[in-house]
Amino acid sequence: DLLLNSIMGMRGLKPTLAAIDSGKQIALANKETLVAGGEIVMQKVAEKGTTILPVDSEHSAIFQCLQGGVKPKKLLLTASGGPFFGKKRFELNKITPEEALKHPNWSMGKKITIDSSTLMNKGLELIEAVHLFSVAPENIEVIIHRESVIHSMVEYADGAVIAQLAKPDMRLCIQYALTYPNRLQSPVQGIDFLKIGSLTFAEPDEETFTLLPLARNAIKKGGNIPAAVNGANESAVSLFLEKKISYLDIFDLVAQAAENAVYIKKPSLDDILQTDKAAREFVRAKTR
């Protein structure tokens, strides 16, 4: 039996744990489950002998590139860069929700589209990858790839790099998780490489898009800090969409909430839930 968890946000954590307890294989589209409670979730997965199949395009790509069973040297997470690629912080001061919701390549929900624009989505995906693939955060590199054709890559010890390429269409990732290990006919058309012509790559601007390094530092510290970052971000994005805070306030409030969190090295599920709640309340209190 397979359960597809596509619940948005931290609300997906408890259903994921319940599904693991029931012994079900899980197709996971809810990245916050692993961001906030990754250690608890993956420990329970090991205990129950079940499997998590990633639905996110980047993690699905890595999962496919790892099918040879050889330990990777490095994971390379690709990012579109969002609608504000190339802009500096001072240019983001008056960004509206309507502008931030115009993603150049993907059609997604509002929250994940805002996260993509701030690069927090890539930060959350980095944390998710640490747990899913047992790779240290320093061995995960984020690369801006504007075309969103390469969905991620894996580098091995011999220098070989394996990449998964497809059109930016979530139907393919969802289908692969639901039909794994089989590959069935898909409604997604193949790539016409001659029309694409070239693929480009760039380094992310972490001085402007500070939530990416913040997320990386959160998983390096570990414990309940990723849960604080995630909870604060969910709250801040919601406030931005309600036009109660500015775009740059998202960056500042999440950083402040992470700094304010009381560190717990080995958090229980209750600790994770309380950390999430406290981070959300911190953000809300700052905006009253």
Regions found by a protein language model. Give the residues of each.
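Catalytic, metal-anchored helix/loop core of enzyme active sites in primary metabolism
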Residues: D1-R288
